[in-house]
Amino acid sequence: MKDLLKFLKAQTKTEEFDAIKIALASPDMIRSWSFGEVKKPETINYRTFKPERDGLFCARIFGPVKDYECLCGKYKRLKHRGVICEKCGVEVTQTKVRRERMGHIELASPTAHIWFLKSLPSRIGLLLDMPLRDIERVLYFESYVVIEGGMTNLERQQILTEEQYLDALEEFGDEFDAKMGAEAIQALLKSMDLEQECETLREELNETNSETKRKKLTKRIKLLEAFVQSGNKPEWMILTVLPVLPPDLRPLVPLDGGRFATSDLNDLYRRVINRNNRLKRLLDLAAPDIIVRNEKRMLQEAVDALLDNGRRGRAITGSNKRPLKSLADMIKGKQGRFRQNLLGKRVDYSGRSVITVGPYLRLHQCGLPKKMALELFKPFIYGKLELRGLATTIKAAKKMVEREEAVVWDILDEVIREHPVLLNRAPTLHRLGIQAFEPVLIEGKAIQLHPLVCAAYNADFDGDQMAVHVPLTLEAQLEARALMMSTNNILSPANGEPIIVPSQDVVLGLYYMTRDCVNAKGEGMVLTGPKEAERIYRAGLASLHARVKVRITEYEKDENGELVAHTSLKDTTVGRAILWMIVPKGLPFSIVNQALGKKAISKMLNTCYRILGLKPTVIFADQTMYTGFAYAARSGASVGIDDMVIPEKKHEIISEAEAEVAEIQEQFQSGLVTAGERYNKVIDIWAAANDRVSKAMMDNLQTETVVNRDGQEEQQVSFNSIYMMADSGARGSAAQIRQLAGMRGLMAKPDGSIIETPITANFREGLNVLQYFISTHGARKGLADTALKTANSGYLTRRLVDVAQDLVVTEDDCGTHEGILMTPVIEGGDVKEPLRDRVLGRVTAEDVLKPGTADILVPRNTLLHEQWCDLLEANSVDAVKVRSVVSCDTDFGVCAHCYGRDLARGHIINKGEAIGVIAAQSIGEPGTQLTMRTFHIGGAASRAAAESSIQVKNKGSIKLSNVKSVVNSSGKLVITSRNTELKLIDEFGRTKESYKVPYGAVMAKGDGEQVAGGETVANWDPHTMPVITEVSGFIRFTDMIDGQTITRQTDELTGLSSLVVLDSAERTTGGKDLRPALKIVDAQGNDVLIPGTDMPAQYFLPGKAIVQLEDGVQISSGDTLARIPQESGGTKDITGGLPRVADLFEARRPKEPAILAEIAGIVSFGKETKGKRRLVITPVDGSDPYEEMIPKWRQLNVFEGERVERGDVISDGPEAPHDILRLRGVHAVTRYIVNEVQDVYRLQGVKINDKHIEVIVRQMLRKATIESAGSSDFLEGEQVEYSRVKIANRELEANGKVGATFSRDLLGITKASLATESFISAASFQETTRVLTEAAVAGKRDELRGLKENVIVGRLIPAGTGYAYHQDRMRRRAAGEQPATPQVTAEDASASLAELLNAGLGGSDNE
C-alpha cells in the first residue's frame, strides 16, 4: 500500500519554475526528446485497429495503447510496470505517455523552417543580409548561391543562375563552391562568425550618416547580438531533424461504418514521410540531379505545409477542398491553443438556467432549483452520507441520490448552508459580472436573482440565462465570501458610486409614497411618530400623501462616533414618515423628506455607505426594495391612453412652423438663400417647433389644478402615471413622452442626415403610412448599429485588457513628488466636472496651501476623502496637484499612493490589486452605450460654430492668461497672442467659466475687471483673421506692386476699393520673389521698432490678405492693418463615440493634424517650393534654426517675425498625441487623452474615474527610445522598456557613470500589447506567429510577471490573493527553502478529518 501511495504521489509532482524561455531547438535536442524515429507513413492497421510498427502511431515509439498492457498482450497488469516486451518492443506503462512522448523524422535533405524564412522581417534574410527573393530562389532550387569564392572573382553569397553556374564551372573548375537548396543556406549560416560580424557592423554604424542605413544596421546588430547572447546557432533555423507530435495530440478516431476521423496533422506528416522516404531511395539509387532536386523541393514544400500551411503559395487542401490545419493554425486565433484552451477553459461543477426575479430574497441570496443543487453538490452529499453512516460505500450513496430519498434532501440543506455559489451572466464585461451568493433551495427550474444586482449584471428577466459555479476548496469558498459576495460589491469600481441602486418599480413605489398632495385625506394631523403614521394609513384615516406634522427622532454621530438623539416635530407626509422607519440610525430626516427620485435614492444609499459603512447600507438597500415593491403595488400606477394628454397648442404651433417653412421655400425659389441654407433653416424651424410642442405638453402634464383646504385653487405636481414614471426616473423620459403625446419630430436617414419633413403626429394620434415608413428607417438602423457596436466594443475591451493586464499595485509608496495638476473641467460657461469630483480619492503630491496665504491646508501624501474635499471647497481651492499613476516611479507595477482610493471599497488601494484589468473593464464596459456614428453637423450646430463674441453667464472678475495685448485708439485692449484663455473668477476665487480668446479680439473689459452676468466681454470677426499693429506711425508699402504682387478690387455694394495680395501661384515671374509687407515708419520716415525688441515693425502679408488702407496713412497701435479671410472649416464631421475612443487609445495620427512649433524662437519664412512654404524658427539664443515644409493650403496662425514658444500651435487642426508628448511632455499628453476620452463618455452620461484612463496611458507610455547610449549597453535609436532604462541608469549613476538619455514613446494599445516584455502574453493576443518567431530567435525569457502569462502556464495570478502566494514563493526561493505543504486548518470540525488523513498518509514518511 505504501509504495502505491508513494507511486501516486510521484505521479502528481509539479515543477517549480520562475520563468519560461523559448529558443531554437538544435537537431541534437530534437533527437533527445524523441523516443524513436518514425520511418513509415502508415497509421493503424485497418483490420486489427492496432498501430503499425514504426508508423505515425507506433506503440514502440510512443507507448502502449492500453494502460499497463503491451501491444501483443504478453504483459498485462501493474506488476509488469516498466518492462519492455521483447516481442513487440512496447514498454508497459500508462497510456497517457502517448500524450507526451515525441518521435522524430531524420530528413534526407535539410529544409528551411518557414517561420524564420517568411515571417516578416525574414530572420534568415536579415542574418545573411540577402533579399528574401534570392533566398527563396535558392531554397526552391531555381538558382545557385556561392558559398566559397576561393581565388575566383565570385563573391560569397552571390546568386548564380543555372547558365552562369555552368559558365563558372567551365571557367574555374572546382576552385569555387556553389550549391542550391537548404544545404546551401545552411552552409552559409554555419560559416558565419557572429561576433566578428557584430564588430564590423558596429564600426560601420559609427561611420555612416544616412538614416535608413543606420536603421538597417541597428536591426542587424540587434539580431546578431540576440543570437550571440541566447546561444542559438543560426544553422538551427534550417531543420535536419523534424520532431513528431505525440499521437494523442493528433488523434485518429474510428467512426462507426469503418471510417476514421483524423487530425489534419496526420495527413501533413504522411506527406513529409512519403516524400522523405522517396528522396532517400532516389539518393541511394544516385538518380539524376534534376529528379533529386525536384524531390527535395517537394520535401521542402511538405515541411512548409506541416509547419504553417498557406504561408507560402497555395495552401494544401484535404479531400473536401478545405485547407489543412497546420501546427501554426493550432495555436493561433480565437480557436487556437492560447485563446481556446489556455485562457478559457470549461469547468466542472457548473450549471446554467433561465433567471427569474426573487423579490423576497435578501441581497446576499439567490434561489437555486433543487434539481440543480442536487447535481452540483453531489460529491459533498456523498461525503456527508458516508460520514453519517447512512451509506456504506460511495456506490450506495450514489444510488440513494439517484432515487432522491427523503434523507438526501435534508443532507443537501446542510451541505448548502453557508456554501456560497458564483453566478455569472455572459457577457462578463466587468468584475461585477460574476458575484457570489448563498443559495436558497427553491422548487421549479429557474434560478432566482435578487432585483438589486440586475444593474451590475445588466440582466433582465426576458429570457436571460445565467451560469452557476461551485467553489470547492475552503480557500475558494473563503474568497467567494469575503471578496465576491454581492453584499461586498455595493460600489462600482468604475466610478465609486453605488451600483446596488433600486430601479423601475422600486423607484416608482418610493417616489409615490414620498409625494405630497394638496388637501389629501388627513391633512393637518399631528402624529406622535412614524408608527402612528403607519397605523392611521392602514386604518384608512389618512392618505399616503397627506401633509402632516410628525414627531421624529434623528440620530447623529458626534466626534467620538457615538449616536446622539434629537427629537423634533417635522412637517412631512404620512408616506415619508412610514419610510423613515426603515432608514438606519445616523442619517438625517431631510434625506427622506422630499419626493425621492432615482438620483435622490442613489445619493441616499451613497451617504449611508459613507457615514455608516457596509452592513447598514446592505440592510437599508434591501428594506428600500421591499418597501418600494409594496407601495408600487399599492399605488396602482398604470399607463392608460388617457394619460397621454396632447397639448391644445400643438395644432397652432405646427401651422405656424409650416407657414415659416413655406416662406423660406419662396425665398429659395427667388434665389435669396442657397439650397444648403434653406435646408438648415427648415430643420431649425422644425426643431424649434418640436421643442415648443414638447414644452407645452410637459407644462400640461407636470401640474394639475386642485382645490386646497381654504377652497382656493392651487397648482401642484401632477399625479399622471406616465409623468410620475418619467419624473421619478423609474422608466421613460421626457423625449419618449414627447413621442407619445407631443410630436415625433425630425427623423434621420440611415446615413445620419436629417429628413427635412418631420413626423408631426404622435403615437397616440397614430402615424399615417408615409410617417410610418420614415420611422422604419431609423428603427432598422438602430438595430444594425447595436449589433456592430457590441462587436466593436468587445474588441476594444480585449485590447485594453491586454495592454493593462500586468499592471498591479506592488508597493505602498514610491516616494515621488511628481503628479498632475487637477483643475475643474470647464467648457465655456459650464462647470462640467467640479474639482471635488476629480480629486476625491486621490493622494496629494505636495502640500495644498490656503489660497493667498502660506498656511498648509492639506499636507502632502494625504488621501483626499469627502471631508478633505469639503475643506478644499470651503477654502475655494482652484487647483490641486495630485499623485498619478502616470508619474509613479515604481519599476514594475504602481504604488498605492499614486493610485489612491480603491473605488469599489472606499479606502486606499491594497497591494496586489489588479488595477490594470479593473481600468480596462471600467472603460470597456460602457462601450456598448457609446454611439457608433460620426456626427454630421447641420442646422443649429453649424451656426454656433462661428462664434463672434464671448458672453459671460455669472458675475465675477475676469482673468486672462497667456496674454499679449495692445491698447487701440479707443482705449480698448486688443489681443495679439495666440492661445489666450479668459477665466471668470467668482468672489471666492473659484474659476466658474473659461473661454478661448482668438487673436485680434477686442476686449470690452480688461484683466481683473468686474463684470455682471450676461455681459459681453470680447468681440471679433469670425470670418477673417486680422493683422494688428503693435505700434503707431505711418504705413509704408513695401513690395506692393500692382499687377505683380497685389491687385485692386472694388466691392459692388459699397463702392469701396481694397488691395488684395496675390497668392504666389497667381503672381507673374517677376513677383515670385517679392515679399509684400506693410512697414510702420515715424513722421521722419525712420523705422519704428517693436516695443521690447530691436526689430523694425514690418508686417509681411500672406496671399489673399485684404488691405483697406492707403500708402502713407497714419495709424495707431491696435488698429487692423489687413484682414486674412478664413475659409470656414465647412461642416467637418466630428468622430464621436466608440470610434473616437478607439482612435485615442490607438494613438492614431489625425488626418490633418495641427502643426506645432518644435522649438521656441522667431518665425520667418524661407524660400518657397511648389505647393509648400518653408517655415523657419530661429531661436533667440542663436542656436541652429529649425526648418519645416508646410503645405500652402494650411492656414497659419503666425506672421513673420512673431515669437513662438515650443509646442505653440502654428496651424490649427486636431492635435496629434505624439506631438503633444514630444513638445509638451508626459503630463500634457495625459491631460489630453484623459480629457478627450472623458468628453466622449460624458456626452453619453457615463461616469468613469480619470485614474482608469491614466492607467491605460501609463501602459501606452511604457516604451522609450534611446537618444544617446552613455555607458549603457543600449543602442542609439533602440526602443526599450522605460522601466529597464530607469533601472540601468540608476545602476550606472550609482557607479558614477553616464546614463543613457531617452525620449518617451507613445504607443497605441495594440502596439503596446505586442511590444510587452512577455512573449507569452503577446502571442496570445495577436500575430502569434510573428511574436513567437521573434522570441525564439532572441531566446527570450518570460519572467511571468503579468496575469495572462500565469493563467496560461496554470498558476495563481500575481494579483489579489495570488499576490501573497507569489511573494511568499519568492521569499522561500531566496532563502533556499523547500515550499512547505500548506497546513489545512479549517474549523475544528475538519480538524478530526485532517487527523484521519494524516494517519493514513503519515506512515509513508517515517521509514
Swiss-Prot record:
Cofactor note: Binds 1 Mg(2+) ion per subunit. Binds 2 Zn(2+) ions per subunit.
Positions annotated to bind Zn(2+) 1: C70, C72, C85, C88
EC number(s) per entry: 2.7.7.6
A cellular component annotation (GO) from this entry: DNA-directed RNA polymerase complex
Cofactor(s) of this protein: Mg(2+); Zn(2+)
Residue positions binding Zn(2+) 2: C814, C888, C895, C898
GO biological process, one term: DNA-templated transcription
Entry similarity comment: Belongs to the RNA polymerase beta' chain family.
NCBIfam families: rpoC_TIGR
Function description: DNA-dependent RNA polymerase catalyzes the transcription of DNA into RNA using the four ribonucleoside triphosphates as substrates.
UniProt cross-references to PANTHER family, sorted A to Z: DNA-DIRECTED RNA POLYMERASE, DNA-DIRECTED RNA POLYMERASE SUBUNIT BETA
Name of the molecule in the record: DNA-directed RNA polymerase subunit beta'
Organism: Salmonella paratyphi B (strain ATCC BAA-1250 / SPB7)
Phylogenetic classification of the source organism: Bacteria, Pseudomonadati, Pseudomonadota, Gammaproteobacteria, Enterobacterales
Name of the gene encoding the protein in the UniProt record: rpoC
